[in-house]
Amino acid sequence: MKAHGVNALAVAKTLQSSPYVQDVLYPGLPSHPQTALAYHSLPPHALKFVDQYRKHNSSPEDNSFPYSGMVSFRIKGGAEEANKFLTSMRIFSLAESLGGVESLAELPAEMTHGSIPPAERELLGIGDNLIRLSVGVEETEDLVHDIEQALEATFSG
């Protein structure tokens, strides 16, 4: 779980700094509205790991921390951009959760929540541009590079 969290945090930070991303939903980022709740809900062993991680991997102004392997984000644009991003990924596989340690990506509006009427999905914040990532335990740099190249492929023309 540590590797999932560390990788997910790196992916979330990469997405957050991208001009092609509208917003990132990851409780370990200070920008998340429930980041304090997420931190205080950690069990003692996870809290110990997070505090050690922050001590050795974060600057004083960076209050982020590894929190699960799930990252959601809204790509700028709509379904066309979201689908292009997903098909441009090389490491992340397009699939719903398979219970493994490999990185997966999905478009909830078309996959897990496809049976919900569009108007209801919008009320729930599940638009056509929402992408959900299950970040695996591959090399962090490889995952970050995959995100960056897929974003470039999507928006480069």
What do the predicted segments below correspond to?
Residues 1:
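Flexible, glycine/proline-enriched loop segments at strand-loop-helix junctions
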Residues 87-88, 97, 103-157:
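PLP-dependent enzyme catalytic core of the Aspartate aminotransferase-like
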Residues 9-90, 94-103, 116-122:
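Conserved small-domain helix->loop->beta segment predominantly found in fold-type I
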